[in-house]
From Swiss-Prot:
Designated name of the protein: Plasticin-TR
Main localisation: secreted
Family: Belongs to the frog skin active peptide (FSAP) family. Plasticin subfamily.
Gene Ontology biological process terms, A to Z: defense response
Species the sequence originates in: Phyllomedusa trinitatis
This protein's UniProt keywords: Amphibian defense peptide, Membrane, Pharmaceutical, Secreted, Target cell membrane, Target membrane
Tissues of expression: Expressed by the skin glands.
Role: Has no antimicrobial activity against Gram-negative bacterium E.coli ATCC 25922, Gram-positive bacterium S.epidermidis ATCC 12228 and against fungus C.albicans ATCC 24433 at concentrations up to 100 uM. Has an anti-inflammatory effect, since it inhibits the production of the pro-inflammatory cytokines TNF-alpha and IL-1 beta. Has high activity of stimulation of insulin release, which may protect the species from being eaten by predators by causing fatal hypoglycemia. Is not cytotoxic to cancer line cells. Does not show hemolysis on mouse erythrocytes.
Amino acid sequence: GLVSGLLNSVTGLLGNLAGGGL
């Protein structure tokens, strides 16, 4: 998710796509 992306820049890109933005 977007929040995960802010907290984890490393997994942020994958987390954002997998999290659906949130």
